[in-house]
Each structure stands twice: as structure tokens, then as C-alpha cells.
């Protein structure tokens, strides 16, 4: 039974309808809901009592209004109440690196590739992700292509984290109540509050994260949400070219939560000794294409078997180094962002990140499907 302060069990269908319609009317008037109101709405959704048409209207309305800090905090709190959590023993230097999605760029899976680099550098990675909803290659799609068995239990995922230093928390295995929202999200095919909630609801209780957002005006609000939820060291990043990653092409806005304070600043690739470059060639049409580019980049080799131009591979490495460097930094393995990027570059040259990916894939195949 979810440990939630609110329950819909004693509400009649008419009462649920009234709560939902009242909330929708306020949202459409661009009035923010209180945390208590949003907790009740999210509990109704998680209990499967929100009709699809109403859910679509609520998600669209929140998107158009822009979700408030209180609305996001309350929603994340309810999702965590309903989640199947795990508690890995090796929590020192534990990190997640994840994007909200919804940026429409169709880049290769930068955060997933970066996770293997961070793990190879010594971080414990609890990677939370899902299938692509508004992109052509979600992290789960990519990892299945790489040979990972995602049909494992939460406890088996915990075992991966403890033995391999990295595990992939496939959202449907941990957030089973989210099944009620999947049809509507797939039908909408645009970013919703659930894109925002994914990074906030890591079932391993990760306190150090790099989180990419689809628009940089979400950086500071989301950093404050993380503060509300008890996170320790977080970089919320959104680039000027509207990527939910640290961009190789331009400046990236950062809202950094550290020591209980949120600081906002801009970073450039040159800050970490990397030249700015266009993103041409880094977009993909499928998880297969994304995997090929990532394997070539993580291999450390100067040639590849996929027929990919080496300049594209080198560009992908630079993009991965920037984002993995941030993860290494917030995990506590680097004194600052540039030092983290330098560590990431060394890992990329060594080929250890690809070995980490292959080892995790092999380990997950030892579990019964």
C-alpha cells in the first residue's frame, strides 16, 4: 500500500470528478495549485481514477501554464510514495544523469552514454530511464539494443548497482502506478509534467544528479524542487540551443544545488578545454543508430566498424565528456566541472566505458527472464 498522506479510496466517483474539474478550471485560468491540491490530483492519477480525456487536459493545461515549484514538488512526492524503491549498499559517490526529454532534438543518447563513462571513472550510477515517448530513442530502447535484459526485478537492479557499479532502473518496473498515464502520454507525444518528474523520482533515492531540461527557464525552479526533496548536489542544465544536455555548440545554463544553496551561471565547452562545435551529425533516427555512434565513441579507437565518419565520433566523444564530466563532479569524484571533464576524456580514450557497458549487459543476462 503506498505510503501516501492522501487516499482516494473513500472518494466517490462524483467527488473525484469535482476535484478534477475544479483543478482543471484553475489551471486553465493560469492559477497554480497548492501542494495539497496537487498531491490529491496526482494520487487520483496514480490510483487510476482520472479518465484519459481529463488527464490529457490536465497535462496540456499544466504545460501551457508552466508547472510551479509546489506542483512539481508535490507530484514527485506522490510518485515516490507509490514507487518500488531499492536501497543499494554502495551509496558513496552515487549519481544519476538524466534528461527530461521533450527537446525535440533527436540527438544520440548522451546521458546514457555518459552514465557508463561516470561508472568507469568510479561513480556508482543508478540510472533512471524509460522508453522514448517524444524522442526516437529512449534510454531503454538503446540499452535493449546493447543487449541488456531490462526485464529484471528491482532487487536484481540493486544487485547490478552493487556488483557492477551501475544499474538501470527501468521506470515501469519501479513506477507501476504510472501505467495509468502511459496511453495518454503516448497519444500526446509532447513533453508533460511526467518528463519533469522522471529525474525527480529515482527509486534508489539518489541525492547527486545531473539533470537536463528542455528549456533553460526550468533550471532554477527544478533545482529548488530538488532542494525541497532533500537532494545534496545537483546540476540542472539547459542549453541555449534548447537541449536537455550540456551543449557542445553553445552556452548552457546551470542551476547548481550544493551545500543547500542554489547558484545559477552559464558554462561553455571552452571552460573545460573543449572547442565549441556544431551538432551536425549527432542526430539519430533510431536506437540502432544511437548505439552505433555511442559504441564507436566509447571504444577509444580512432577507427570504427560502423562506417561512421571519425569526425562525428570525435564530436560525440566531446559531447559525452562534457556531460559525463558533470556527473563525475556531482558524484564527488572531481573538485570542479573542468576536472570532471578531464577525467571523462581519459576514460573515453581508454575504452573502459565500453567495457563497462558490455559487462553490465552480460551480467543482466544471467537473470532469468
From Swiss-Prot:
Top EC class of this enzyme: transferase
Residues reported to bind anthranilate 1: 99, 130
UniProt: Mg(2+) 1 binding residues: 111, 245
Positions of Mg(2+) 2 binding: 244-245
Swiss-Prot/TrEMBL GO biological process terms: L-tryptophan biosynthetic process
EC number: 2.4.2.18
One Pfam family it belongs to: Glycos_transf_3
Cofactor(s) listed: Mg(2+)
List of residues binding 5-phospho-alpha-D-ribose 1-diphosphate: 99, 102-103, 109-112, 127-135, 139
Reaction equations catalysed: N-(5-phospho-beta-D-ribosyl)anthranilate + diphosphate = 5-phospho-alpha-D-ribose 1-diphosphate + anthranilate
GO cellular component: cytosol
Pathway: Amino-acid biosynthesis; L-tryptophan biosynthesis; L-tryptophan from chorismate: step 2/5
GO molecular function, one term: magnesium ion binding
Free-text comment on the cofactor: Binds 2 magnesium ions per monomer.
Binding site for anthranilate 2: 185
Keywords (A to Z) from UniProt: Amino-acid biosynthesis, Aromatic amino acid biosynthesis, Glycosyltransferase, Magnesium, Metal-binding, Transferase, Tryptophan biosynthesis
Subunit structure: Homodimer.
Protein family according to the UniProt entry: Belongs to the anthranilate phosphoribosyltransferase family.
Protein name as annotated: Anthranilate phosphoribosyltransferase
Amino acid at each position: 500500500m503506498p505510503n501516501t498522506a492522501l487516499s482516494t479510496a473513500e472518494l466517490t466517483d462524483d467527488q473525484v470528478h469535482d476535484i478534477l474539474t475544479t483543478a482543471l478550471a484553475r489551471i486553465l485560468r493560469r492559477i497554480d495549485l497548492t501542494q495539497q491540491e496537487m498531491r490529491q490530483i496526482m494520487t487520483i492519477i496514480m490510483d487510476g481514477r482520472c479518465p484519459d480525456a481529463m488527464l490529457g487536459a490536465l497535462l496540456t493545461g499544466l504545460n501551457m501554464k508552466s508547472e510551479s515549484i509546489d506542483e512539481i514538488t508535490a507530484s514527485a512526492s506522490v510518485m515516490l510514495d507509490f514507487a518500488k524503491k531499492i536501497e543499494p549498499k554502495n551509496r558513496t559517490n552515487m549519481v544519476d544523469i538524466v534528461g527530461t526529454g521533450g527537446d525535440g532534438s533527436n540527438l544520440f543518447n548522451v546521458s546514457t552514454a555518459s552514465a557508463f563513462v561516470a561508472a568507469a571513472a568510479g561513480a556508482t550510477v543508478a540510472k533512471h530511464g524509460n522508453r522514448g515517448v517524444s524522442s526516437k530513442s529512449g534510454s531503454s530502447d538503446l540499452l535493449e539494443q546493447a543487449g541488456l535484459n531490462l526485464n529484471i526485478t528491482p532487487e536484481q537492479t540493486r544487485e547490478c548497482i552493487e556488483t557492477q557499479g551501475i544499474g538501470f532502473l527501468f521506470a515501469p518496473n519501479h513506477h507501476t502506478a504510472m501505467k495509468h498515464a502511459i496511453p495518454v502520454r503516448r497519444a500526446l507525444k509532447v513533453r508533460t509534467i511526467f518528463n519533469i518528474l522522471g529525474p525527480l523520482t529515482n527509486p534508489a533515492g539518489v541525492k547527486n544528479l545531473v539533470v537536463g531540461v528542455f528549456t533553460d527557464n526550468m533550471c532554477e525552479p527544478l533545482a529548488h524542487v530538488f532542494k525541497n526533496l532533500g537532494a545534496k548536489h545537483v546540476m540542472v542544465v539547459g542549453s541555449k540551443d534548447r537541449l536537455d544536455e550540456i551543449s557542445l555548440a553553445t552556452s548552457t545554463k546551470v542551476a547548481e544545488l550544493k551545500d543547500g544553496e542554489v547558484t545559477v551561471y552559464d558554462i561553455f565547452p571552452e571552460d573545460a578545454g573543449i572547442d565549441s562545435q556544431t551538432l551536425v551529425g549527432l542526430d539519430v533516427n533510431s536506437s540502432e543508430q544511437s548505439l552505433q555512434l555511442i559504441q564507436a565513441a566509447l571504444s577509444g579507437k580512432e577507427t570504427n566498424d560502423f562506417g561512421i565518419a571519425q569526425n562525428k565520433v570525435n564530436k560525440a566523444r566531446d559531447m559525452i565528456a562534457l556531460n559525463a564530466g558533470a556527473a563525475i563532479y556531482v558524484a564527488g569524484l572531481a573538485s570542479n566541472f573542468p576536472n570532471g571533464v578531464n577525467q571523462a576524456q581519459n576514460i573515453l580514450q581508454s575504452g573502459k566505458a565500453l567495457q563497462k557497458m558490455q559487462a553490465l549487459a552480460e551480467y543482466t543476462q544471467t537473470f532469468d527472464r
